[in-house]
Amino acid sequence: VNFLDNVGNYIKTFDTKQNDIVVESKGEEITNIVNYIVQTAKEENVSIPQLWLPRIPNMIYTEELKAKYNYQAVTNNINPIIGEYDDPDNQRQMLLTLPISKEGNTIVYGSAGSGKELMLSSIIYSTITSHDSKEVNFYILDFGAETLTMFRNAPHVGDVILSTEKEKIDNLFKMLNQIIEERKKLFVDYNGSYDFYINHGGKQIPSIIVMINNVEGFLDTYNEYEELMGQITRDCLKYGVIFILSTNGPNTVRYRLRQNFKQNVVLQFNDASDYGTIIAGVRKKEPSKVYGRGLIALEGIYEFQTAYAYKEEKLTEYVKIICEKLQTICEYQAKSVPTLPEVVTSSLLKNSFVNLQQVPVGVNKETLAISTINLAATGMYTITGEDISSSTQFLESWMKLLQSRDGIKCNIIDANNILNKNNLGDIKCSDADQLENTLNEIYEDTKSVHIFMILNINSILNKLNVTDKGRITGLLDKVKSKTNVKIIIVDTIDNIKTISYEPWFKTNVSLSEGIWLGNGIANQFTLKVTTSSRVLRAEVETNFGYVITKGKAALTKWITEE
């Protein structure tokens, strides 16, 4: 650039060439402004409230949630912690509990691997660590991975039943029906309600929670119980009985049964459209792909995370330790599901031996109660069957049980020597020729109760002449005046039929009472049995028979030696 004066002379000259300066690009201006503000805020330690809370962690623990939310259990109100839910609209995260006592039956939904067993274990753990075993009892049917067996030793848990234990499953439902019938009668004066009974002066009785893990597996194997479950779950809450089921899909539980379940807990489904089948108004909302995440419908629809009882890798060990500690704390042990013992022993029956009105002989197969007979009603009692020689173990074991009771003396006449005398201990067992002497001896002793068993009496009488037979039958008939003597007549049904018309027998024996050994009871007409012949024609196993009481026959497993 040249500067000139007024006559054209150069006054000053400048060089306009500039050096190129490279400036680093830092992006758009608005971005740099924001970054500058953020950096300045950090330096000045300035912050503003977040729009939402941090997401719930993948691993949360029941005990930590109890402390965080100051959870306090209420006696007889079963409301266990199951996790924590997120309510971003109101910027809050809240404790998630399952109001079992209030809302009752519950279904836990979720695809395989979604955390259903975690949810069930959380329900059990939170309940047993917050309530006494007098308040709540669990009966668990584990048709899944069988991980719930870790709770087996808790005093609150009556039984953990696996898929192969058919007898226990049968007996559980019998027991539930019995409990409900008993409570119906018990609650008559308390508005027919468990809650009203508990809160208004009734005795403490536990809520019963029946938990079925993998209910579709249960119903596939035992589909005969679907209708019964529908009947029980319809009104069971008012009797203090609650069902909790877990299932893989939204339609695996039929609507007729599903309508009896008020609460739904939904974990992850493989198909996003399945959420709307269970939760109305869910739209496109889905839980995060995290184990134990799910959706729950409360005031709105919220995502939740299931709580762990303990660190996953040590969960089983921890739960077993807790169960052992609870055993030392809780005085009451939940009643186990009764089962028919493999061997009915004297130790099992002896406490039921109250008096001659209740003499135990075995276990009722249907009710699993101790079967008893009444020896006090008449002077004689009959034990019969098509073949008595196959039931000698029962006869020997039963007589030893009678002999073990103070004040009772037992004697046996074994006409055909079918018993093993070595198995009778100190019981006197004589041959047929000692019948008269034995009768005279026991009639003379009025201080003791005498149980006198005569086997194959018909063969004894058939060998006697008219005079001797008259003398023996006269002695037998004398028992009606001896209240301390009871004669047990053991013979085949054909022989019982032969002597049933004789006066000494008719006077002292009731044919609507007695014991039948083995099969064939439906083929005879000597004993007065009113039970359906269709029932009586069923095949009877070894060591089984019928106790006949007032004409009704009850299938019974007999006492045998241990």
Task: For every predicted segment, state its role.
Residues 1-102, 218-221, 225-227, 263, ...:
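Conserved P-loop NTPase motor module
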Residues 31-39, 170, 258, 275-279, ...:
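Generic detector of well-ordered alpha-helical segments enriched in charged/polar residues
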Residues 68-192, 200-269, 286, 347-512, ...:
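P-loop NTPase catalytic phosphate-binding loop
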Residues 172, 271-281, 510-513, 518-531:
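Conserved AAA+ ATPase core "coupling" helix
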Residues 179, 183, 280-287, 530-535:
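Conserved AAA+ ATPase "sensor/coupling" helix adjacent to the nucleotide-binding pocket
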Residues 239, 273-276, 547-553:
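Short, highly charged low-complexity linear segments
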Residues 273, 278-298:
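Phosphate/diphosphate-binding loops
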